[in-house]
Regions:
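N-terminal leader/targeting segments and the immediate start of mature chains
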Residues: 2, 15-66, 76, 129, ...
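Bacterial N-terminal signal peptides
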Residues: 6-15
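Short, hydrophobic/aromatic-rich segments at coil-to-beta transitions
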Residues: 38-42, 65-70, 134-141, 162-165, ...
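Short, surface-exposed coil-to-beta transition loops
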Residues: 53-57, 148-152, 164, 176-178, ...
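An acidic-aromatic
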Residues: 55-109, 168-180
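Intrinsically disordered, low-complexity linker/loop segments enriched in Gly/Pro
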Residues: 103-152
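Gly/Pro-enriched, hydrophobic low-complexity segments
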Residues: 133-199
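Short, solvent-exposed recognition patches
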Residues: 201-289, 303
């Protein structure tokens, strides 16, 4: 009898130890986020922004609570980025440099790093399964509940939850950015990248020169798309960026999935009227208001940028009519 009970207990424990299947789109998105930060893996993929297509190799290792990664461009001039403990080094046909950042954000779908539980105003939809790169993937759509943000379609590996493919779409379902895996490998053999990265001398760390507000900015946004919140603001002398005098003011906003920055600077005599440019998911919109130029750079549609500019409010001291 004791043997029988022990067998039942053992069976119960083994069943409880089996990972429960994911049941909701949010489960898949959360698992994807964790997988990309904690698995040891390599992905060969194509990354398209507008008409520009690049082939790349991304290697990632997680060791002793730290992430190590290498992103290598496989075409034309060799260019690579190295991640080591919240610092990314850039190497290519330019002066090497490093930036303080926890992720490699260039030519890689930043959607994998989002905290999906904190997103506001999006619907997560399950679109079934599909085969990608000889893997079975779960198709998840991230759809905004308005027309002022972009949407994502994601193909997530059913076994290890790595992202295999993604489409960033505008309101008309045009693909603005595409990530498509050709080959995906997961395993502890990728830990071999840790030691070379740990011993690598990274280039000089560039310090950002945007200063926190020396005085309150004399303007504010009365409207932003749903879910966006200001995460930073500051002032910078143009002489630090360009051979010009004057100051540029900025406010950075994010909803946890997309971001944009609004810049305000003194007009130099050339008026900008509803000028818009876009490459992939990044848009640039400029408008002159009085003697000020307003420039918006970020991952939002033209309709959103226009609405934001229309709702800028200046204080009485800084009003530009």
């Amino acid at each position: 009898m004791k043997k029988y009970i022990a067998l039942l207990i053992s069976l119960f424990i083994s069943i409880m130890g089996i990972a429960q299947p994911l049941s909701t789109p949010l489960d898949y998105l959360t698992a994807m986020n964790k997988a990309h930060q904690t698995l040891n893996y390599e992905q060969l993929y194509l990354f398209q922004k507008g008409d520009d297509v690049t082939s790349l190799r991304y290697r990632h290792a997680y060791y002793n609570g730290h992430e190590y990664a290498q992103l290598l461009h496989l075409d034309a001039i060799r260019e690579e980025m190295i991640l080591r403990e919240n610092v990314v080094g850039y190497f290519g046909d330019y002066q090497p440099f490093s930036l303080k950042t926890p992720y490699i954000l260039d030519d890689f779908p930043t959607v994998v790093y989002s905290d999906f539980s904190q997103l506001d105003g999006y619907a997560f939809l399950d679109n079934g399964k599909m085969r990608v790169a000889d893997r079975i993937a779960r198709v998840i759509r991230i759809v905004p509940r308005d027309d002022f943000r972009y949407q994502y379609m994601l193909w997530i590996d059913e076994e290890n939850y790595l992202l295999l493919q993604s489409h960033l779409l505008d309101r008309d379902n045009n693909v603005l950015e595409q990530f498509r895996t050709i080959q995906s490998v997961v395993g502890d053999q990728l830990l071999y990248i840790v030691e070379p990265i740990r011993t690598l001398i990274l280039p000089t760390l560039l310090q950002t020169k945007i200063h926190s507000e020396l005085k309150p900015l004399e303007w504010q946004l009365k409207w932003v798309p749903r879910g966006f919140k200001q995460v930073a603001s500051g002032q910078q002398n143009l002489s630090e960026m360009l051979a010009q005098d004057g100051q540029i003011e900025s406010r950075l906003y994010s909803d946890g999935l997309f971001s944009f920055t609004v810049y305000l600077l003194q007009n130099k005599g050339i008026s900008f009227q509803d000028q818009f440019w876009r490459e992939g998911k990044t848009s640039v919109y400029s408008q002159t208001i009085g003697d000020k130029d307003v420039i918006i750079v970020g991952e939002i549609p033209l309709a959103s940028a226009r609405h934001i500019v229309q709702e800028i409010e200046f204080s009485s001291q800084g009003e530009k009519q």
